Regions:
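Short mixed-charge
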Residues: 185-205
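N-terminal Rossmann-like NAD(P)+-binding domain of SDR-like oxidoreductases, especially those catalyzing
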Residues: 1-162, 167, 180-185, 192
Length: 207
């Protein structure tokens, strides 16, 4: 949404083919003249290559991931394929078809795992404690290797808590904020009724 404020910027959103696609988080800008959905899947090398080859992006921002830490224990191979191999596929496609493209990969504080000190910095050792954390560590090192080996503009940002109205309601912090909003609405609704009743039962003069 922020990028679309620039009339010179065209934004492509990569999405997997699905019988029941969910457009809830893109409804505010899906119809923007400078935005377009394209099909692609981080687990499919050919589709990622086609995206880079056909679009020729100046920037490639990868926020896609299987991001449920608990679920990563149930399907570790899939999590590694999406979060680590998916980044590798992006880097390979950029190297082949648009080496001047600037690539950003989203990391996670889960990379640090069992922490030695807080707050962590880039010098803190990475000791992940879940397949999810390990997959993000792998992506981190792949980005570094490709940047140094092929002179690509590739960076990996380690993200900590990040929130927004479009964050899934299955996350703990979203449950908390929704609960706060519900309580506020209930209190506000009660206060409105009290004010209404007070006004209804009061004498008033017209001025």
């Amino acid at each position: 949404e922020y990028l679309l404020r620039d009339p010179q910027c065209r934004v492509f959103g990569m999405m997997r083919r699905s019988a029941n696609p969910n457009f809830q988080n893109t409804k505010n800008f899906a119809d923007h003249e400078n935005f377009k959905f394209i099909f692609g899947d981080l687990t499919d090398t050919i589709s990622v290559e086609n995206v880079v080859k056909n679009i020729q992006p100046d920037y490639f921002i990868n926020f896609a991931a299987n991001s449920f830490v608990g679920c990563s224990w149930d399907m570790p191979l899939h999590v590694m394929d999406v979060n680590a191999n998916g980044v590798l596929r992006c880097l390979e496609a950029i190297k082949k078809f648009k080496p001047e493209c600037r690539f950003y990969s989203a990391g996670s504080s889960e990379q640090f795992g069992d922490v030695d000190y807080s707050p962590q910095d880039i010098k803190h050792p990475m000791k992940p404690r879940s397949p999810y954390g390990a997959s993000k560590c792998a992506a981190h090192h792949l980005v570094k290797v490709y940047r140094e080996s092929y002179d690509l503009y590739a960076v990996h940002g380690i993200l900590f808590n990040h929130e927004g109205t479009k964050r899934g309601e299955e996350f703990v912090t979203r449950k908390i904020t929704k609960g706060v909003a519900r309580i506020f609405n209930e209190i506000f609704s009660t206060q409105k009724k009290r004010i209404y009743n007070a006004l209804k039962n009061s004498d008033a003069d017209s001025v």
